[in-house]
């Protein structure tokens, strides 16, 4: 039986100011060719995945990383150029998880997959204002 190994690594996409979210991924996963695999990306508990977009990247041996997709919600997502629909994103907000599903696994899917998070622009601006307010308040107390 042929197996495709899918290695996972950590990538934290840092956006904005203030405390940054951390993402955690299992070190590896594997499945059979032709099957579907779901890779997970857990956001640190002090951040709510509901306000973040999840970005997924693939890096094949000897190649630079390539953008696969961005997922915020079913109605707010973006597939990378030339990325087939068998790559899809989803979220579990109750468990603070983002997922990359790859269906119909093929030999060329053997790669390192990176997840990253980024705030939606309006949330990023709100959090930057809050952080600047906290910083100003702290500076006044000095």
Curated annotation (Swiss-Prot):
Region (Framework-1), start-end ranges: 20-41
Entry annotated with the keyword Disulfide bond: yes
Disulphide bridges: 41-115
Keyword entries, A-Z: Disulfide bond, Immunoglobulin domain, Signal
Region of interest called Complementarity-determining-1, as start-end residue ranges on this chain: 42-56
Keyword DNA-binding set for record: no
Record-given protein name: Immunoglobulin omega chain
Chain segments carrying region Framework-3: 82-115
Leader sequence segment: 1-19
InterPro entries from the UniProt entry: Ig-like_dom, Ig-like_dom_sf, Ig-like_fold, Ig_sub, Ig_V-set, IgV_Light_Chain
Span list, region Complementarity-determining-2: 71-81
BP term (GO), one: B cell proliferation
Region named Framework-2: 57-70
Record-linked PROSITE patterns: IG_LIKE (PS50835)
Described function: Associates with the Ig-mu chain to form a molecular complex that is expressed on the surface of pre-B-cells. This complex presumably regulates Ig gene rearrangements in the early steps of B-cell differentiation.
Origin species: Mus musculus (Mouse)
Name of the gene encoding the protein in the UniProt record: Vpreb1b
Family named by the database record: Belongs to the immunoglobulin superfamily.
UniProt note on tissues of expression: Only expressed by pre-B-cells.
């Amino acid at each position: 039986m042929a197996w495709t190994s899918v290695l996972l690594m950590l990538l934290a996409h840092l956006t904005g100011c203030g405390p940054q979210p951390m993402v955690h991924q299992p070190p590896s996963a594997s499945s059979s060719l032709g099957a579907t695999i779901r890779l997970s990306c857990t956001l640190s508990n002090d951040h709510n995945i509901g306000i973040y977009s999840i970005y997924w990247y693939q890096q094949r041996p000897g190649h630079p990383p390539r953008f696969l997709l961005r997922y915020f919600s079913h109605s707010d997502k973006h597939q990378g150029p030339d990325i087939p629909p068998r790559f899809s994103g989803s979220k579990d907000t109750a468990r603070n998880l983002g997922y990359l599903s790859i269906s119909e696994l093929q030999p060329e899917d053997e790669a390192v997959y990176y997840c990253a998070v980024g705030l939606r622009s309006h949330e990023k601006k709100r959090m930057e204002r809050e952080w600047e307010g906290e910083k100003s308040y702290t500076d006044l107390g000095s």
